[in-house]
Regions:
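Helix-rich effector regions associated with P-loop NTPase G domains
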Residues: 2-52, 59-79, 85, 91, ...
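Canonical P-loop GTPase G-domain recognition
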Residues: 77-79, 85-140, 245
């Protein structure tokens, strides 16, 4: 079901939530302790490499990047790869590049590894970066084997700057969903989609209109997908089985559908690009 022009105009003019309740959320619990060990291991490994290739999600180009890379920028050539460009709304790509350049990042590339978009540009860029470094000579770069790749596990920053940044990272699948809460994540996703007028979920799930109430949306999703469950209810005449929507299952589908790009491309850092800091900054 597609939104008619009138319905789309009505949705765009609707008064959506201006903020998302963030108080009382334990962000530290979302990021497992083993990542601290991973950071130490990565830091020791960095001494062995000639160039750092940092891979980050293009939907959050400004949020959640590891400060470890910032500390090593002056010592090692550095390339930032913003992957999953096919899932990101890159309307503001020029502003993203300008923002990153203001942070000292001049070597940035957007990629889509699934369709091999721009991926083949990485090795030539790395070769050029190493060749430009005063520590290396061009002939050393061209010897066989051309280069060795030292892969490291994905490790987040030891401290997340805000609850909202943590939610963005969670939406991109950086942490296990159950640590944050699937229904909480689904609500934040709905809030974000409506706020930025991305109404692809209405069309995908065949809803009558855009909605800002996550319970109503998940109920419609559950009914459409047949995700229901029997629940026993105690009444004056005994136990009665009733059928009710399986909200957790609907929330999981909502999140997975977003991550596959079926709800349309989204830029989760749009507010940051426009100069608005993430909400509920941690002390």
């Amino acid at each position: 079901m597609r939104l008619t022009p009138r319905a789309l105009c009505s949705a765009a003019q609707a008064a959506w939530r201006e903020n998302f309740p963030l108080c009382g959320r334990d962000v530290a619990r979302w990021f497992p302790g083993h990542m601290a060990k991973g950071l130490k291991k990565m830091q020791s490994s960095l001494k062995l490499v000639d160039c750092i290739i940092e891979v980050h999600d293009a939907r959050i180009p400004l949020s959640g990047r590891n400060p470890l890379f910032q500390e090593t920028l002056g010592l090692k050539p550095h390339l930032l790869v913003l992957n999953k460009m096919d899932l990101a709304d890159l309307t503001e790509q020029q502003k993203i590049m300008q923002h990153l350049e203001g942070e000292g990042l001049k070597n940035v590339i957007f990629t889509n590894c699934v369709k091999d978009e721009n991926v083949k540009q990485i090795i030539p860029m790395v070769t050029e970066l190493i060749g430009r470094s005063h520590r290396y000579h061009r002939k050393e770069v061209s010897e066989r084997p051309l280069m060795f790749l030292l892969d490291t596990p994905g490790v987040l920053a030891p401290r997340i700057e805000s609850v909202e940044t943590g939610l963005k990272l969670a939406l991109c699948g950086t942490v296990l969903d159950h640590l944050v809460g699937e229904e909480t994540m689904a609500d934040y996703l709905l809030y974000t989609l409506n706020k930025h007028q991305r109404f692809g979920y209405v069309q995908h799930y065949g809803l009558g209109s855009a909605c800002d109430n996550v319970e109503r949306v998940l109920k419609s999703v559950a009914v459409k997908l047949g995700k229901t469950q029997k629940v026993k209810v105690l009444t004056g005449t005994g136990n009665v089985n009733i059928i009710q929507p399986n909200y957790p299952a609907a929330a999981r589908d909502f999140l997975q559908t977003f991550r596959r790009g079926l709800l349309g491309s989204v830029m989760l850092d749009l507010d940051v690009l426009r100069g608005h800091p993430p909400a509920e900054t941690l002390p």
